[in-house]
Amino acid sequence: MWRCPLGLLLLLPLAGHLALGAQQGRGRRELAPGLHLRGIRDAGGRYCQEQDLCCRGRADDCALPYLGAICYCDLFCNRTVSDCCPDFWDFCLGVPPPFPPIQGCMHGGRIYPVLGTYWDNCNRCTCQENRQWQCDQEPCLVDPDMIKAINQGNYGWQAGNHSAFWGMTLDEGIRYRLGTIRPSSSVMNMHEIYTVLNPGEVLPTAFEASEKWPNLIHEPLDQGNCAGSWAFSTAAVASDRVSIHSLGHMTPVLSPQNLLSCDTHQQQGCRGGRLDGAWWFLRRRGVVSDHCYPFSGRERDEAGPAPPCMMHSRAMGRGKRQATAHCPNSYVNNNDIYQVTPVYRLGSNDKEIMKELMENGPVQALMEVHEDFFLYKGGIYSHTPVSLGRPERYRRHGTHSVKITGWGEETLPDGRTLKYWTAANSWGPAWGERGHFRIVRGVNECDIESFVLGVWGRVGMEDMGHH
């Protein structure tokens, strides 16, 4: 390390000019505007001192990273246009800096006062009294490092930044974007309906419900930051099944809000709910269309009460129900109540699920969502190991429910065949493949084949004629 005695200060301008004259021509460093002239100053930073670095004359490698730029600890930096590190004068020359100290912290070319804040994705950074930033260290739902690792890892699917998730922590994603409570042991042990393939019956290698039943399979909705996948997936499957089983005479998009607000027995609305309770309500009480009772979009309201139920019905005989209230949406007059028959559980064999789906329509599936699923952009999803070496708080999962709409196969570059399900999520059309995703089939990936439900829409001849 070189330190300049105070007696040599008068020679410093001359040393700077000599160093400049020794160069052949003028390089980028000479032509660039000085850091401090651009207002890039961090008087509280310890740069030269941290590295014990002071250099004579001009030494372009006597440099350090500095607020997105480069600063120097050599005598040449102290020319008319200065690019010295902020502690150069104090540490190397033993004199006060020629620039007034900043009362605050620098970020993005802007000065923040002490206790001022800015957000770095999901983490809040606060300016401390020592003029240094202190940032939270929460795992973010959108993790650029994880996106990069997945896309470079050849896992068979692509990751990306879903803008609606930017700024959310991973914990918030698990709490607000899922919402299906894992069924009790008694429900998980409910009797399975086994579907038997006929002798010689061969299922197609690819199937999509929207191709067999055009205009009867509804597009995904967006649950927002409401932990209500239990209501959204139930309403989605019931909507398609009622449309299919009525032969297209009834094509409602059923209301998740009707379930969220009115199915309150052991249910928690936007704080989570159970699938068995949702299907009981649809069978015994029924719901109206989403146009009649639209989603209110309440988000992250953990402390407040659930929106009150604004739709009620009465028995008409033979199990049918009739609405006793007008639509919450005053622009809609049709308040018809839609119901289903008792829900049934399918076997976990993928062939049984495929046959049921092809004959009767989309099915509902429980699944475990891991931290990387939120980043899904396209391809055939399987949970990746990219977070295995990180602390446990970066490896989170929760229970979700979705609508399976079809299946297919894809030939990999090495010649292997990869089988997959196609499914509709409830995170809106901007997520994944237009609101849908593909996931590996036949190996119970993320438990998606462990608890699969089907149901029949309650449709009578009077319904067919009425509609």
Swiss-Prot record:
Domain called SMB: residue spans: 50-98
Cited SMART domains: Pept_C1
Keyword Signal: yes
Expression (tissue specificity): Highly expressed in aorta, heart, placenta, kidney and a colorectal adenocarcinoma cell line. Moderately expressed in skeletal muscle, pancreas, lung, lymph nodes, adrenal gland, bone marrow and thyroid. Weakly expressed in colon, small intestine, ovary, spleen, testis and prostate. Predominantly found in vascular smooth muscle cells, but also in cardiac and skeletal muscle cells as well as kidney.
Signal sequence residues: 1-21
An example Gene Ontology biological process: endosomal transport
Alphabetical list of Pfam families matching this protein: Peptidase_C1
Cellular-component GO terms for this entry: collagen-containing extracellular matrix; extracellular exosome; extracellular region; extracellular space; lysosome
Known glycosylation sites: N78, N161
Subcellular localization, as worded in the UniProt entry: Secreted
Top-level division of the source organism's lineage: Eukaryota
InterPro entries attached to this UniProt entry: Papain-like_cys_pep_sf, Pept_his_AS, Peptidase_C1A, Peptidase_C1A_C, Somatomedin_B_dom
Family recorded in the similarity comment: Belongs to the peptidase C1 family.
Stated role: May be implicated in the adrenocortical zonation and in mechanisms for repressing the CYP11B1 gene expression in adrenocortical cells. This is a non catalytic peptidase C1 family protein.
PANTHER family xref list: CYSTEINE PROTEASE FAMILY C1-RELATED
Name the UniProt record assigns to this protein: Tubulointerstitial nephritis antigen-like
